[in-house]
A protein has these predicted regions:
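Catalytic tyrosine of NAD(P)H-dependent dehydrogenase/reductases that use a Tyr as the general acid/base
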Residues: 6
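Active-site helix of classical SDR
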Residues: 9
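Strand-loop microenvironment adjacent to phosphate/nucleotide-handling motifs in alpha/beta enzyme folds
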Residues: 15-218
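Active-site His/Glu-centered metal-binding helix of metallohydrolases
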Residues: 12
Length: 218
């Protein structure tokens, strides 16, 4: 369940891929869902390592925040193993990443490995959750069904959503070279969500107002 624009665009990408399988059945299309890839650009461990090297406190958004992690080899294996599954075309695959990891525990272990003592409020500080950031990640939505495959750690996610309207809306926006309309379209689907973060609501409202202003000026 996306709560920010990045999550929304990822879900839209999944829908496009699955729609392509319906439109071009002679070609195999499928998508994979990643967890947080350790060591990748923007991930928490490179951030913590940089802060340690600079003598800075480790920053985390909340003491209770958790995340699922996978290594780069696991990410590669997920793509390769999913791609050879007979049941993969037209599906979304994800990896069994075990239990989510508490970021506070990750910070504590990195400090210990670097020979430093853990001192909350001194070398570890809490900055607060950012707009659109989740406390805990969900690998699958409540209305999705997860199925096992012949690959022990690879699962397929079945979603009840219909995909036909998404590609059509994207085609209209892209065909008109209208970036505002495209973003507005992406955000609008989540406008009715009760727990939608204010940042996403504000972006949707801003895009709508900007689009209306452009129409008036034209």
């Amino acid at each position: 369940r996306p709560v920010n624009v990045m999550g929304a665009t990822k879900q839209i990408a999944e829908r496009i891929i699955l729609h392509l399988q319906e439109e071009y059945p002679n070609t195999s299309f499928g998508a994979v869902r990643f967890g947080n890839v350790l060591g990748s650009s923007g991930s928490v461990i490179p951030l913590f390592k940089r802060q340690l090297e600079n003598g800075e406190p480790l920053t985390l958004t909340d003491q209770d925040v958790t995340r699922y992690f996978m290594t780069i080899p696991e990410a590669v294996q997920l793509i390769l193993k999913a791609s050879i599954l007979d049941s993969f075309p037209g599906q979304v695959a994800m990896l069994d990443m075990g239990e989510p990891i508490k970021i506070l525990d990750l910070a504590r272990n990195l400090l210990r490995l670097s020979g430093r003592q853990f001192r909350m409020g001194e070398n570890v500080i809490v900055t607060g959750l950012r707009p659109g950031e989740k406390m805990h990640e969900e690998l699958a939505a409540p209305d999705e069904t997860v199925h096992a495959t012949e690959e022990r750690r690879v699962f397929l996610v079945e979603t009840p959503e219909e995909f036909s309207e998404i590609p059509y809306g994207l085609r209209v926006s892209l065909g008109n070279a209208d970036g505002l309309a495209l973003l507005d379209f992406l955000v609008a689907e989540f406008g009715a969500a009760e727990n939608q973060p204010s940042a996403l609501k504000e972006l949707g409202a801003t895009l709508t107002m900007s689009g209306s202003k452009m129409e008036q000026e034209a």
